[in-house]
Amino acid sequence: MALPGFVLGFLLFTLLGVASGIATGLSPGLHINNVAALVLATRSTWASFIASVFPDAADSETVGLLLACYLLAAAASHAVFDFVPSVFLGAPTEDTALATLPGHRLLLVGQGAKAVALAARGAVLGTAFALVVLIPLRLLLADPVDLAARFRSWSPLFLIFVISALLASEARGRRWRRVARAAWVQAVAGLLGIAVLRGLSPLDSGTVLFPLFSGLFGIPSLLFGLASRAGDIPAQRIEPLRRLSRDDVASAIRGTLAGASVSWLPGLSGGAAATLASLRLRKPIGPTQFMVVLGAVSTSTSLLSVAVLFMIQRARSGAAVAVADLLIDPGRWSNPIATPASLLLLLVATGLATAIAAPLAARIAR
């Protein structure tokens, strides 16, 4: 495919990804894994569309690369816009205010727009810092340190520790019933994963993952929202966001490092990493800085999880699994100073999508 045509296709699919991320991010209950599963299930339809618009891009390699750029742009945009319904929907009552998320706490004092703007700022900083740690992470996980391979034998013990720590976090005030319920949920989730991934189902991954992710990420959120009693949202104050501070940078770095951990450690999600980190903090950070951390975690995880695919040939997220399937054979990042061309395009798509989505999300929240 000629370079001008490919650049045009790259920009088109990146912008389509941003638009899709806006739609899914603003829709409560939708997850980017739903989009990933849907793209895999409808790949042939996408290929026909690309061939009709860009006849020179009919080969499977170009189609897969454009769809991967679309998916990562959607993931980055979704990570930013997902904070809008997270903050403004399901507002708690006064009786439950102390147990709510930091975004809701800011909403209850009239600073909901500020919460979204801070998360968007964290998303931009997280993307920038993720690019900074990219090469050091490559040197750490692959040669010469080869930490990913060395850590593999310790994975079972690590997962046992993570599960135990998460269960312990539910034992506040000796509420052992909470621990029992959490253990039951973890057991059911494990059995479901074994049945789907190791079972004898004749269905391909694209067909199985879409209803699975819809049930895990979509329907429960909608049912919980319908069953919850929302409180009144107070009048919101629209104030200009303060200038970038050292606390913002420090919070974004903390979030990026957490995202880097999530991107390669097996079985560790962003929520689990945040829970484990909170168990070790002597003095928790305030809600404003926590929103910056969350924004940085979301976008850095999205970017670095795909980069890790090229480093160690293992996918740690739904989007990374889809990218590996779309690219058919993502090349290994063998030379630390020579980044694979396909990875560079994916990084550019992610960075461009974040740069577009962050100011839009902050404006929509107003």
Show the residue positions of the predicted features.
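Membrane-embedded alpha-helical segments of transport systems
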Residues: L72-F81, L118-V133, M291-V308, V348-L352
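Membrane-embedded alpha-helical modules
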Residues: L118-A227, G331-R366
